[in-house]
Amino acid sequence: LNVDHRVAYQASVTASRPVPNETVKKILCFEILSSTEWSDKNKQVFSPNYFIDISKFIEKKLKALKIYDKEIKNSPNARSLKSIKNLASIRGSSIGTHYAEAFFVERICE
């Protein structure tokens, strides 16, 4: 939805093209509440296929996000700490853990 995010994504993927001895091994796209779910439905919709258990770090994540006081909103906004924690809980239940971060694999080179 955000044009600057799309441009940054395209620049990152372009700059990360596989080349001998300098290949970026993994490119993961992450979910941004109040942006990802409003993307152009004619384009690829965020469909996570890579999850990381963040149960040990959820409170640290929330504490770190508080620094971004211009981005974090009050509940029930999608970018409230409550909503962020709730989404992490839902993503965690998808993989059988308390909290998880969900990603879409753009590319993995092994």
Predicted regions and their residues:
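Metal-dependent de-N-acetylase/amidase catalytic core
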Residues: 1-110
